[in-house]
Amino acid sequence: MEKTNVLIVDDSSINRELLQYILQDRYQVYQAENGAQAVEMIQSRERIYRLMLLDIQMPVMDGFDVLECLGKKKLLKDLPVIVISGDASNTAVLHAYELGAVDYFSKPFSPEIVLNRVQNILSLYKHEYQDALTGGYNRCGFIRKTENILHNAASAKDY
């Protein structure tokens, strides 16, 4: 069975590696060092990410800017975002939710909590692209997969 793609976005290599270690047995994990790199990876449509774990305080492009950018491009409807940040203030949490985050928790974090939250969010969103009876793509999943294939074919240099 193909593993679900998860994108980790954090400027701290230690945090990225720790999250990768927690998730790698169940998920195909990809990493971005900053928000700009994450947006580029998502927009390239090279692969379909089913979930993003996002830090807020990063250089180049912070997590709030990532949420705002993806929201404007209508990319958050298919990509649930869990914010994992050192800033646990009500203002930061509320702002992340207003910009489209589906969950938010602060660092330091428990590996069990991370894994359970990721599983819960993915199971909630799974019905949007997967048929419950067959396990195959439903209409929305098929359309999204087709769009990605067409996008990749159009941008391919060797054809």
Spans of model-derived segments:
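Active-site-proximal structural segments of metal-dependent nucleotidyl cyclase/transferase enzymes
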Residues: I143-Y159
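Two-component/phosphorelay signaling modules centered on CheY-like receiver
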Residues: T4, S12-Q31
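Active-site beta3 strand of CheY-like receiver
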Residues: E46-L53
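Conserved nucleotide-binding and Mg2+-coordinating catalytic segments in signaling enzymes
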Residues: K126-E147
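Receiver (REC) domain active-site loop signature in two-component systems and cognate sites
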Residues: M58-M61
